[in-house]
């Protein structure tokens, strides 16, 4: 059994496969996922697990050099934005339109669907390198 925090086999596999500049997305229960994008559904019920729980878990193992968030989170969900900023520290944020975020899911290695039920709780993580 693994000793690390990420024990979901699908998430662990995607993280292990990530290269520099590859992307992994995490989102709320309502985010549409394009056909062809690997969807890892960890939602159990409304709110479980939360977006922040899943983000915290993934950040424990994935080296992230940049994140992408929807512009709309600034006004529609400032509490979630504050929680994200607290987790990512000095990692640069690029704000994009939500419609662009949905299109960019086509390029993601995978999308992790959480049980989150708050608006614009979606993020694209751009992989960095550890050297």
From Swiss-Prot:
Keywords: Carbohydrate metabolism, Cytoplasm, Isomerase
Keyword Iron: no
Positions that bind substrate: 28, 98, 120-122
Pfam families: RbsD_FucU (PF05025)
GO biological process: D-ribose catabolic process
EC numbers for this chain: 5.4.99.62
SUPFAM superfamilies per UniProt: RbsD-like
Pathway assigned to this chain's UniProt record: Carbohydrate metabolism; D-ribose degradation; D-ribose 5-phosphate from beta-D-ribopyranose: step 1/2
Active site (record annotation): 20 (proton donor)
Predominant subcellular localization, coarse grouping: cytoplasm
EC main group: isomerase
Alphabetical list of InterPro entries matching this protein: D-ribose_pyranase, RbsD-like_sf, RbsD_FucU
Subcellular location: Cytoplasm
Catalytic activity: beta-D-ribopyranose = beta-D-ribofuranose
Gene Ontology MF term list: D-ribose pyranase activity; intramolecular lyase activity; monosaccharide binding
Keyword set includes Cytoplasm: yes
GO CC aspect terms: cytosol
Described purpose of this protein according to its UniProt entry: Catalyzes the interconversion of beta-pyran and beta-furan forms of D-ribose.
Family: Belongs to the RbsD / FucU family. RbsD subfamily.
Assembly behavior: Homodecamer.
Protein's name in the database: D-ribose pyranase
Species whose genome carries this gene: Latilactobacillus sakei subsp. sakei (strain 23K) (Lactobacillus sakei subsp. sakei)
